[in-house]
């Protein structure tokens, strides 16, 4: 059995659909059912993999209690279960933890700080995991992210802008600058 968190989100939903298409036994968890699952799930011995994609991903969120509960505490709880039952885990971090440098973690907003907190926790417990893979996503895009509005990837925003106006404008005077968006 595979646990996938964040199944109402862009990446989690794609994991869920792909695994189901392959006939895998999947337990899907989103914010509506997360605390119920935490209190009631008791089949950890049957879990083969945890794919933890669930989080508040809004980089403009300033509700620290929510970020702490979802992005930090729930992630630590899942990681502890992965350690306790020696379940491999795939964890969604974020390239936003780097801030303005790639040399060290330097988060510039509360979302990035919440992700960096888990990255550090994982680093402190790395030898206890059977297997952990941390993915630091950056500007992920694709079908099904239209609902994200201002939080949609640059590629989605660019495509919409070009479709609507026939032009691409990043910001005032952007025709004089070069930008690299790794997608």
Where are the predicted features?
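NAD(P)-dependent short-chain dehydrogenase/reductase
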Residues: 110, 120-181
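N-terminal Rossmann NAD(P)H-binding glycine-rich loop of SDR-like oxidoreductase domains
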Residues: 2-21
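SDR active-site strand-loop-helix element
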Residues: 5, 29, 50-54, 89-95, ...
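Adenosine-cofactor binding site in Rossmann-like domains, unifying the SAM/SAH pocket
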Residues: 26-42
């Amino acid at each position: 059995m595979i646990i996938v968190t964040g199944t109402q989100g862009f990446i989690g939903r794609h994991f869920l659909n792909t695994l189901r298409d392959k006939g895998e036994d999947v337990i899907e968890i989103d914010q509506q059912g997360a605390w119920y699952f935490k209190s009631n799930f008791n089949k950890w011995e049957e879990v083969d993999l945890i794919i933890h994609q669930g989080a508040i991903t809004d980089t403009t969120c300033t509700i620290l209690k929510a970020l702490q509960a979802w992005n930090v505490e729930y992630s630590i709880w899942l990681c502890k279960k992965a350690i306790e039952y020696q379940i491999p885990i795939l964890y969604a971090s974020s390239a936003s933890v780097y801030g303005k440098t790639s040399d060290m973690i330097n988060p510039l907003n509360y979302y990035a700080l919440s992700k960096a907190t888990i990255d550090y926790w994982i680093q402190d417990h790395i030898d206890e995991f059977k297997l952990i893979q941390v993915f630091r996503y950056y500007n992920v895009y694709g079908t099904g992210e239209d609902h994200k509005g201002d939080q949609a990837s640059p590629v989605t925003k660019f495509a919409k802008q070009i479709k609507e106006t026939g032009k691409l404008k990043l910001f005032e005077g952007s025709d004089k600058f070069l930008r690299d968006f790794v997608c």
